[in-house]
Amino acid sequence: ANDTGMSAGKNAGAKGTSAATGSNSTADPLVYDHSMELSYAENFAVDYYEGGYKLLTTRLNGDRILLVPKHQQAPKDAEALVSPSAEGEPGKLIVLQEPVKNLYLVASSVMDMFVQLDSMDAISMCGLKEEDWYIPAAKQAMKDGTLLYAGKYSQPDYELLLSQNCSMAIENSMIYHTPEVMEKLEEFGIPTLVEYSSYEEHPLGRVEWVRFFGALLDQEEKAD
């Protein structure tokens, strides 16, 4: 299943790119610069490369997201990129072009972090109905029609996700109870990120996941 994930991730990464050089051209290998220093969180890593590239890793499954700056290309060696601090086998690679948008947010506890980061506009679909949200900003976005209900984790509305050009689904580990949904999403070229904030032992480790999403959304300064 890993291979399909990888190719799906690559396809999804090509969405929304406007680089005139075509999708086959690749950039030179990346040069590692530094890593985000974390105080409490143990389940993710963020590594920075020269030229504005970033590699986000979720440690429990080894999955990686390569963020490619606007108008840049993914490097030739993208598949081989591994966080210097990662242990174990690398998982799938998802390539996303910045700015990251059209997300399908199923892990509802993360919505608060997007609100803190002032990045609600990166999410266009979610896994809760308007009446089930306890976060006023999410309720309001659904009222305004800027946030659409795209089905719960076990029954996503694939048609809606595709029509909204969904770039990635952000799930919690519940998705592992329905592996067929994960496979179907990948088949449609929609990669899945499983967030593990609830697996952090230290309560402040959970809170620190805002920095993971800050890196994803290019809002590091708001996350600190």
Where are these regions (language model features)?
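Generic hydrophobic, helix-prone segments enriched in Leu/Val/Ile
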Residues: F44, A138-K143, F212, D224
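N-terminal hydrophobic or amphipathic helices and topogenic motifs
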Residues: A1-P99
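Phenylalanine-focused residue identity feature
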Residues: F44, F114, Y153, F188, ...
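Extracytoplasmic substrate-binding proteins
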Residues: T146, E159, S163-D224
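A short, structured surface patch at a secondary-structure boundary
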Residues: K54-L162, M168-I175
